[in-house]
Amino acid sequence: MNLKNKLKGFPTIYYTNLDHRNDRREYMETQFDYWGIKDYRRVSSSKYLSTEEEKWEHLVLDETLLFGSAAVANSITHIEMIKNWLETTDDEYMVMMEDDYDLSLIEYWNFDWEYLMNQIPINWDSVLLGFENKEYIPFFLHPFNYNHSFGPCLINRDYAKKIVKLHYFDGKFKLNIKINDERLKKVFGMADCFIPHSGVTYAIPLITNNPDFGSDYDLNGEPRGWFKECRDLYYEWWQKEHHKFTLNEFFNYGKPNDGGMVRHLKYMNKIKTIAYL
């Protein structure tokens, strides 16, 4: 294990960024430089702007969608990004993320990328390298939970082909592919839903968001009050708690002590209290 070069072999990162958000671009690329990440690509999120829906809405084959134009634009941007990756590289894997993620916790990883790749289950299609959840964060590798948010994501080539086959047809996009989970019916067709739910996805809490860039608001401008608390839990875990558990415990689930590696948010208790009052 090479802890002096933890990211050796890390796949190319594709990160999405609006053209006018140079602050976010500089933030991400400064982080990449700091960690010695040379293989990254910026993907413009401005090709499909929610404010210019009339320019691209004809490319969406769905007659009805349950979410706003910002989420639609984000979804077709991700599909096109994955398609372009398949057509322009022979890479086995890619990592996709948005431009508001904090890579600082890499400092505390007590393993390298090669070790991680040797630990993830053999049947994986995608692995979330970070996520938020309104209720709790399991600080170990585990199957993706429907209530997790979508975050930095590792996907393999076969799964990328499946996503494109499901959602891309002769230059147009079909988003609303049903997933038979009633808890998700309001987000069928969103990239946040179809990328983790169209195959076998695992989650591992490695990378957190940076709410200073407004990442605690969703694509419709609604506040996500739990994001900052999740970030605080990530920092608490990696700075103070992760050394209490072995790597074997961190990279496996279904253990007798899983409960001791879960951290609960106060956010939902606050919401319930407000509702009660």
Residue spans for each PLM region:
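An acidic/histidine-cluster motif and surrounding catalytic segment
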Residues: 1-97, 101-277
